[in-house]
């Protein structure tokens, strides 16, 4: 049997989509997923029989068979939850691997953990790559922004694979480049996510100002965001904000009006803020975005506290044009903030 170019472990939606993307680009892929009775059963078989049917992807239910199915040097992409799960999987994998083999961690791992893993594998003659992947489920399937870093020796081997599945810039350049040694790839992804935290909080506050200060309707706000997306604020987040504002449910009401105002988070924004404190670097916009998420998650407390304050719907008179222009300028703060000189 023809051996695979790359193995992928972890068949969540991101893992499945990356496997399909790799296969579509002509790479031979083998996949494996753990079995957890009652939670994760027959994951590989179901993937091969359904989404991967006819794609030439090899499914393996045994880790030893998975490793044996790979050509040398073996390249294995880990798409598992960040944290102890990565180390536990490495403990199972390393005895099965040889010198020169490559592990790529495609999750949102903490960059200091990646630094440790790079050194651990390097001492064994193997190569570890911490790889930030941005773009979500759609990006994984159709083209993501990919930020690899770690053992430089791995780059010539994995570069063709990663660049083939990356998104393409307007000039056709793949959105994938070697970032640097150690945990550099995951560090850049951490900062990227921190900027996104700031962006999303600014968008949320802009929505609040439009709704409660300018008393605009959803369609009016959608029009403004759509116009902004044609200019300097052109971005995925601004584009989908306009689309979300317009989206109606089957009953005719707006979807946004029925969404619980409690934001979740996975930790990368918090890591960015902690690192900024360690470096004595101001990062107040992103820090406040993290605090805002913490506060929003306390829904019951906010409801309780609101009962102690009188809410008065009294809209001051604002100049519409000046206010909208000011809000547009505010939305660039996350990027401007990171270009300020530091000591």
Which role fits each region the language model picked out?
Residues 336-342:
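Conserved small/polar residues in nucleotide/adenosyl-binding loops
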Residues 52-113, 122, 140-150:
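Rossmann-like NAD(P)-binding element
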Residues 6, 86-90, 110-223, 230-258, ...:
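Rossmann-fold dinucleotide-binding core
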Residues 28, 127, 282:
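Residue-level detector of anion-binding/catalytic polar loops
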Residues 1-61, 65-68, 100, 137-140:
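NAD(P)+-binding Rossmann beta1-loop-alpha1 motif at the extreme N-terminus of oxidoreductases
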Residues 261, 265-316, 320, 324-327:
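A conserved active-site cap/scaffold subdomain adjacent to cofactor or substrate pockets
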């Amino acid at each position: 049997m023809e051996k695979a170019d790359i193995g992928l472990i972890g068949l969540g939606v991101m893992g499945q989509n990356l496997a399909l993307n790799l296969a579509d680009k002509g790479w031979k892929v083998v996949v494996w997923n753990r079995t957890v009775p009652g939670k994760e059963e027959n994951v590989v078989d179901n993937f091969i029989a359904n989404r991967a049917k006819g794609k030439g992807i090899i499914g393996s239910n045994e880790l030893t068979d998975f490793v044996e199915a790979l050509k040398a040097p073996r390249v294995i992409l880990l798409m598992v939850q960040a944290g102890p799960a990565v180390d536990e999987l490495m403990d199972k994998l390393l005895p099965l691997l040889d010198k020169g083999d490559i592990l790529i961690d495609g999750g949102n791992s903490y960059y200091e953990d990646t630094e440790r893993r790079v050194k651990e594998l390097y001492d064994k003659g193997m190569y570890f790559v911490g790889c930030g992947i941005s773009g979500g489920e759609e990006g994984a399937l159709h083209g993501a922004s990919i930020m690899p870093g770690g053992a430089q020796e791995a780059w010539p081997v994995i570069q063709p694979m990663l660049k083939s599945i990356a998104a393409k810039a307007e000039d056709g350049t793949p959105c994938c480049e070697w970032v640097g040694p150690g945990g550099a790839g995951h560090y850049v992804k951490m900062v990227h996510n921190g900027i996104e935290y700031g962006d999303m909080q600014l968008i949320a506050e802009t929505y609040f100002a439009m709704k409660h200060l300018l008393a605009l309707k959803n369609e009016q706000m959608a029009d403004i965001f759509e116009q902004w997306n044609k200019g300097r604020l052109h971005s995925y987040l601004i584009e989908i904000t306009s689309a979300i504002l317009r989206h109606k449910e089957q009953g005719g009401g707006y979807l946004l009006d029925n969404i619980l105002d409690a934001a979740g988070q996975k930790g990368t924004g918090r890591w960015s803020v902690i690192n900024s404190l360690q470096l004595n670097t101001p990062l107040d916009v992103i820090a406040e975005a993290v605090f805002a998420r913490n506060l929003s998650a306390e829904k019951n407390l906010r409801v309780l506290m609101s009962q102690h304050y009188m809410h008065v719907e009294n809209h001051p008179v604002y100049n519409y044009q000046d206010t909208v222009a000011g809000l547009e300028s505010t939305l660039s703060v996350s990027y401007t903030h990171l270009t300020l000189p530091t000591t």
